[in-house]
Amino acid sequence: TYKKPKKFEASVSASLLGAGLYVGYAKKNFSMTHGVRYKTNQYMLGSLETKGEYSPRFLDYQTYISWSPNKRWSLDFIGNISQNQYDFLPTNRQTNFGTMQDVKSFRVYFDGKEEDLFRTLFGTLSLSHSFTDRTKLSLLASAFATKERETYDIQGQYWLDETNTTEQLGVGTYMEHARNYLDANMKSLKV
């Protein structure tokens, strides 16, 4: 059961990590709610071992609309749209490991970037008829669509060193590459 407001109501929230907005409205046999949220974790990700420019962003919108022309019939719609975007431009990483007497250093310098996008749309329309207080029949039409894209080309050059001496234990390079795409659509109709 979703919240149905009795009158106009609204709220706003904001922080360094994002913002949100909610609006609800009702008049006689009609009600609707809408919500929007935006969030970014960009400022929290600066403490990770891999240094670079992190830019994750999340945006979503939800709605619930209800209309009841009389006590027996109701028409309801619920919907959601979301877009999550993750961009990453790595620059370097350094990790120290080992024992107190035998500390090693692993350093990596990067070229390239990662760009990911996840977009989702969902909606359901419901037409319901109550025959009695205990008998209700509903026709539900729903649709879901998603589009996902993960793409990156990141090359890293690495060095493994003894930290107590100038001895170099190893050097190397590697390449990570991906082009992952997913498009999915689903529709359903049920009683």
Please place each PLM-identified region on the residue numbering.
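Short gly/pro/ser/thr-enriched loop/turn and capping motifs at secondary-structure boundaries
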Residues: 39-43
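Flexible loop and strand-edge segments within Gram-negative outer membrane beta-barrel domains
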Residues: 52, 74-75, 79-126, 130, ...
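A beta-strand signature from Gram-negative outer-membrane beta-barrel systems
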Residues: 1-11
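Short, solvent-exposed beta-strand edge segments and adjacent coil->beta transition regions
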Residues: 7-9, 60, 110, 122
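Transmembrane beta-barrel wall of Gram-negative outer-membrane proteins
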Residues: 15-38, 51-89, 115-139, 143
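Hydrophobic alpha-helical membrane segments
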Residues: 44-49
